[in-house]
Amino acid sequence: MGAVAINRKRSDESFNFINQQSTNPLRNSPYFQASKKRRFSFAMSEDSGKPASSNPTISRISRYPDAKAPLRREIHAPSRGILRYGKAKSNDYCEKDANFFVRKYDDAKRSALEALRFVNKGKDFVDLGDEVEKEEVVSDDSSVQAIEVIDCDDDEEKKNLQPSFSSGVTDVKKGENFRVEDTSMMLDSLSLDRDVDNDASSLEAYRKLMQSAEKRNSKLEALGFEIVLNEKKLSLLRQSRPKTVEKRVEVPREPFIPLTEDEEAEVYRAFSGRNRRKVLATHENSNIDITGEVLQCLTPSAWLNDEVINVYLELLKERETREPKKYLKCHYFNTFFYKKLVSDSGYNFKAVRRWTTQRKLGYALIDCDMIFVPIHRGVHWTLAVINNRESKLLYLDSLNGVDPMILNALAKYMGDEANEKSGKKIDANSWDMEFVEDLPQQKNGYDCGMFMLKYIDFFSRGLGLCFSQEHMPYFRLRTAKEILRLRAD
């Protein structure tokens, strides 16, 4: 219910409160909080001294006081004091915002006026429209002296401009047409605080650049002379050196003698399925029978087996015996030697001590130039070589693998073998151990056994390993032919 006086009439304070609300200039502010309105009844506030009107609504509205226009004053934003150490911080956010927009306005106006220096009257024109009407520029010559701008706040500002570098503006008045002479000059003139003396294109700066370049020219000439002199000295040194003639590697003919038609026909008949159970060759010294099924390992894409490898190594030893001057003195261990020497229980010299007796071989191992040891590693064949002539231990893998344990075991074996058979002490552990890298390598997964046999064949001839993967099909046919005839060529 509204507040009512004792005599059932409204007090004058209620009307004063309404009048204050309508005239409060901060009413439209977002931070303004209006107090709660007083509620009262118009029916109880009628004056008894005045006659009642026929239209009660009009009579009630006429009793309200006329709204008074608020005083024209600058609008201030609300401020909030930030208490710090008991003191309120001065609020200058409104002032900063006002200064920010003023600066933006001044910068835009200055840029626009600077661009007008390069505007002339002409046939080709750009209509500036209503924006030109707000400016009044008076100029009697090619330079702009002053500009008077009237803004919405009734403030007048006068800006002095620098004289232009060309007759860009002759007479600019309200409503006239303009033509832009050079847009590049207009863009360059947007910087009002340029210093012409510091411009790199000025004559003084150009002279300084020329002087510094002349100083460098003398140094560059001296360096150029030294370069030419050193090039001549280098050419004289190259001419004085003896020319090195590259030695042409001669590929021997014997390891690559092609098979005749009869020899190829003989090999293909042995590979036929009719001879799988037939014994095609028997090596008496090693007591190994070569059947058609065993010989099938020399067909393309097949893995070599122990019988073929061991028979071929026996044939290489017999070839050396026939022509000892043509081939190196070598010993060829079979594929079971290393498995006996190094088993699952470890190194065991006693397991192979009887393999190399003087009575069985007719010579001592320390008298051989090379000793070949085939190594079978489950699904891959590799080769270890004991080179007595050069006191080296070599390991050859067609897949470029390494295994130091194999060479260490063979070094220990050579020491035990020399002490057991000859009574000599040999420290093979001090020999060079080399894992040969520059050697022919296989390009598939089934020619490792063939590569191993050819390593042995070429080393026993005293030749380098001058073959490749392309020769493997030929070597398979040739090895089959030599096994069938029990003679290695």
Curated annotation (Swiss-Prot):
Its EC number is 3.4.22.68. One of its GO terms (biological process) is proteolysis. InterPro entries: Papain-like_cys_pep_sf, Peptidase_C48_C. Disruption phenotype: Early flowering under both long and short days and pleiotropic alterations in shoot development. It is found in: Nucleus membrane. Keywords: Coiled coil, Hydrolase, Membrane, Nucleus, Protease, Thiol protease, Ubl conjugation pathway. Inhibited by thiol reagent and N-ethylmaleimide, but not by ubiquitin aldehyde, pepstatin A or benzamidine HCl. Expressed in seedlings, leaves, shoots, flowers and roots. It comes from the Eukaryota. It is a peripheral membrane protein. Changing residue 448 to S: Loss of protease activity. Residues 200-223 form a coiled coil. The active site is at 380, 397, 448. Residues 43-66 are annotated as: Disordered. Residues 51-60 have a biased composition (Polar residues). Pfam families: Peptidase_C48. One of its GO terms (cellular component) is nuclear membrane. Protease that catalyzes two essential functions in the SUMO pathway: processing of full-length SUMOs to their mature forms and deconjugation of SUMO from targeted proteins. Cleaves precursors of SUM1 and SUM2, but not of SUM3 or SUM5. Able to release SUM1 and SUM2 from conjugates, but unable to cleave SUM3. Acts predominantly as an isopeptidase, cleaving SUMO-conjugated proteins better than SUMO peptides. Plays an important role in the control of flowering time. Belongs to the peptidase C48 family. Interacts with NUA (via N-terminus). Interacts with KIN10. The N-terminal regulatory domain is required for peptidase activity in vitro. This is Ubiquitin-like-specific protease ESD4.
